[in-house]
């Protein structure tokens, strides 16, 4: 999934309603570089922030899918992925992210009759 600008409404939903920090690719790269140089605060900021791909995913879902329940499920799956993959350095992160997020959305759809 390629990064595209996140719609203001989606950014507001993620940041205000869900308390998620949305980073642009440039912001993410800067924090990765600072973390790699030993900046502990940058590392902690990366842990608190979520990735542009999550915003893209939610942005491309139908509006009635933008629920706290689905977002919580996606965040939980994202945390599982980041325990295994370093998104700053691992080229396979995008493929794993895409596969796992599709699975999480599919499970949610089945459970909610969508």
Predicted features along the sequence, with ranges:
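Alpha-helical promoter-recognition and RNA polymerase-docking modules of transcription initiation factors
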Residues: 2-114
